[in-house]
Amino acid sequence: MSVDAATVRRIAQLARIAVTDAEVPHLQGELNAMLNFVEQLSEVNVEGVEPMTSVTPMAMKKRQDVVNDGEIADDIVKNAPATENHFFLVPKVVE
């Protein structure tokens, strides 16, 4: 894949970046270099390599999957100026 001057101008317009005609060839070369690097990645043999979700080994902390009310309703509403049955009461703003 190759980026032409019109594509550089279009990308600049979409990104709302002012690009002069003198800058277009330089940016075209940089974008093409980036695309060439990405295309090289498709040549890497990854057969037998397990997909990674993180570069560092991590184990997810697990807990029992049980339904509860969170057991903190009183703590949540204790600093609210007005509550009723564990709900926040707010002033009416729409008539």
Curated annotation (Swiss-Prot):
Keywords: ATP-binding, Ligase, Nucleotide-binding, Protein biosynthesis. SUPFAM superfamilies: Glu-tRNAGln amidotransferase C subunit. GO terms for biological process: glutaminyl-tRNAGln biosynthesis via transamidation; regulation of translational fidelity; translation. It holds the Pfam family GatC. It catalyses: L-glutamyl-tRNA(Gln) + L-glutamine + ATP + H2O = L-glutaminyl-tRNA(Gln) + L-glutamate + ADP + phosphate + H(+); L-aspartyl-tRNA(Asn) + L-glutamine + ATP + H2O = L-asparaginyl-tRNA(Asn) + L-glutamate + ADP + phosphate + 2 H(+). InterPro entries: Asp/Glu-ADT_sf_sub_c, GatC. It comes from the Bacteria. Allows the formation of correctly charged Asn-tRNA(Asn) or Gln-tRNA(Gln) through the transamidation of misacylated Asp-tRNA(Asn) or Glu-tRNA(Gln) in organisms which lack either or both of asparaginyl-tRNA or glutaminyl-tRNA synthetases. The reaction takes place in the presence of glutamine and ATP through an activated phospho-Asp-tRNA(Asn) or phospho-Glu-tRNA(Gln). Belongs to the GatC family. Heterotrimer of A, B and C subunits. NCBIfam families: gatC. This is Aspartyl/glutamyl-tRNA(Asn/Gln) amidotransferase subunit C.
